[in-house]
Amino acid sequence: MATQQTARETHGNYHRSVVVPNQMTRVRRASARAARAISTQLAPELRRHRSLPSDVAVAWAGSRLCGALLGLHGIAGESRAELIDDCIDILEPELCAAFEATGSSKRRALASARRCVRSLMAALPRVQRTLMLDVDAAYERDPAATSRTEIALAYPGIRALCIYRIAHHFHQQRVPLVPRMLTESAHASTGIDIHPGATIGAGCFIDHGTSVVIGETTVIGCDCTLYQGVTLGARRFDRTKGGAIRRGLKRHPTLRDGVTVYANATILGGKTIIGSHSTIAASVLVQESVPSHSTVRPGKNEIVVARSDSSRRSERKSGNSARKSLRRTAR
């Protein structure tokens, strides 16, 4: 038995394998070979990284900041100031690692990280004001909501929007890596995928939220409502003559103020504009612009766009007043 390569130790119902020295040597050699093989297959950009931000730390900082912004700091028995100080301590080294990973020197990365932290702290009151309008929108549009506290604590749409608004600020500051890491942490916990580059106005309500996708160049106005399964995506990708994807172009739709998009609807294309106060019915595919005050619903092998009578009356009134003003000007 003394010459066996492995032995079994028993502690109650728990069994643990014990590896003796000669087998440990073989294991280490095998792991070294695997490490060399893996490193040779990495893309050059990934091979040179020595420091990367931690996804766990970034997600933790985002969650803590959301607690401070939504007034949930009392859960941990901390003051809001203590919570924000803790977030700064967590975020600064992760931001520094992100800048280093994209080519900055340690000194420049640290200076950039501190600048971004100061910028975020200055922006937090504005972010919170917008977030409170999101909470109000959820309370006003969801009859199942019993209180704003319930919404702040339990609604996945609010959590996703809170993380997005923090990430969007970093994205505007051209922070590498961290904005996408923040929104992907929210995606993992809520099922709502919002790119940090998207633009979302105040008073947005994402109800239920599972499988909502909001692309990078999407623009959403104020007081819009999205239900589960909604996709605001790209219709196609423009490419160079060499076949590479063109980046930075408008690929995703624009929703004007007051638009409601029901479950599993898909709106595609950078030139697609949904006019203000329009409604997109469930499970509709929209790839063309829709005028204001319209209802888009599926028909037999077609999409039906119907405009409300009130919008027609308001347009006639505005048209008459415009013609009267033109007559007065002509005189």
Provide a role label for each language-model segment:
Residues H187-D309:
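Structural signal for interior beta-strand "rungs" in well-ordered beta-sheet cores
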Residues M1-E184, R312-R331:
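Terminal amphipathic alpha-helical/low-complexity segments used for targeting or macromolecular assembly
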